Amino acid sequence: MKIRIDIPHHPYDIQIEKGCMAQAGQWLRELWQPQKVVIVTDNHVASLYAEKVKLSLEDAGFQVAVFDFLEGEERKNLTTVQKVYEFLVKQGLTRSDGIVALGGGVVGDLAGFVASTYMRGIHFVQIPTSLTAQVDSSIGGKTGVNTPFAKNMVGTFAQPDGVLIDPLVLETLGKRELIEGMGEVIKYGLIEDPELWALLTGLNGSVESILEHAETLIEHSCQVKRKMVVEDELDNGIRLYLNFGHTIGHAIEATAGYGKVMHGEAVAMGMVQISKVAEEKGLMPAGITQSITEMCQKFGLPVDYENWEVGKLYQALTHDKKARGNTLKLVLVPELGSATIHPVSLEEMKDYLVK
């Protein structure tokens, strides 16, 4: 299946097909002329797929080198970026060459940032290998790295030339790594897609059920992301809906220490906490927090952060990228399948941190 991201200045396709990673070279040959390519990945993904993708690209006429770094959210920083820059220079990459981001969200965010800044921007594509990356982070052009202060604090908007999604690679994920991706899938059902929510309701929550329906879950999620990115590429309006659960979720990730709490886990806890307080304030319908909680728990996602410290979380919130002056744009769900922006002051945001 192809989903067109029809952004006027940089349209591209998301290709979703079981087994398509084996044809990565042919796919890229249709996008780029033969040239130098650097595959940016982490050491874990490299051990599984780097050689396979490298050979496919070489068969299609590309000159290929591989750069891998130690896996983990804690490596998504400017130190790693500098190492990639140095590797690209040594390989002689020019503005006519490109980067293939092969991996999960950490790899995709970092490689995209490198591509968008190296020589003021070179071409790149995404081949996401985690559920979170396949349904969310590989699509839409947000790139970035973390700082000690906040997640994704340094970044750019830079669209890839294409996204290649092979649902079969999810079978090599660990249980926790697969399940955390469901945090984003559940979010899509809540903010935009009641049909997806109904599908999730019908699943039993097992790993087997996720893998069996992975292609459909990915397609639904990508369609929601497509709609919001096309209408609002630079995150000033409807695209903000995608941040449901992320305001508190990112604060949890930052205060826990990057890599301790996975992104989808933090989003799940953020959605539950925001909904609980918003429901108490009459801003979200009665019973919706219970529905969200039960859905997250069914798939094995955490719903409560055990190291909850209001002071530290609030400090992290002050660095939120959605803040404008002393106001945060909080995303709420007034009804299933619909989202809205609710501006709150940073002071009022403290209410949403009360357990």
Curated annotation (Swiss-Prot):
Which CDD domains does UniProt cross-reference here?
Answer: DHQS
What species does this protein belong to? Streptococcus pneumoniae serotype 4 (strain ATCC BAA-334 / TIGR4)
**A Gene Ontology CC term for this entry?**
cytoplasm
Places the protein is found: Cytoplasm
Which UniProt key words apply to this protein?
A: Amino-acid biosynthesis, Aromatic amino acid biosynthesis, Cobalt, Cytoplasm, Lyase, Metal-binding, NAD, Nucleotide-binding, Zinc
Q: Please tell me where Zn(2+) binds in this chain.
A: 184, 246, 263
Cofactor(s) needed, names only, are: NAD(+); Co(2+); Zn(2+)
Per the UniProt entry, the Enzyme Commission number(s) are 4.2.3.4
Please give the function described in this protein's UniProt entry. Catalyzes the conversion of 3-deoxy-D-arabino-heptulosonate 7-phosphate (DAHP) to dehydroquinate (DHQ).
Any one GO MF term held by the record is:
nucleotide binding
Quote the cofactor binding remark.
Answer: Binds 1 divalent metal cation per subunit. Can use either Co(2+) or Zn(2+).
Q: What is this protein called?
A: 3-dehydroquinate synthase
Asked whether the keyword Amino-acid biosynthesis is assigned, the reply is: yes
InterPro entries named among the record's database cross-references: Dehydroquinate_synthase, DHQ_synth_AroB, DHQ_synth_fam, DHQS/DOIS_N, DHQS_C
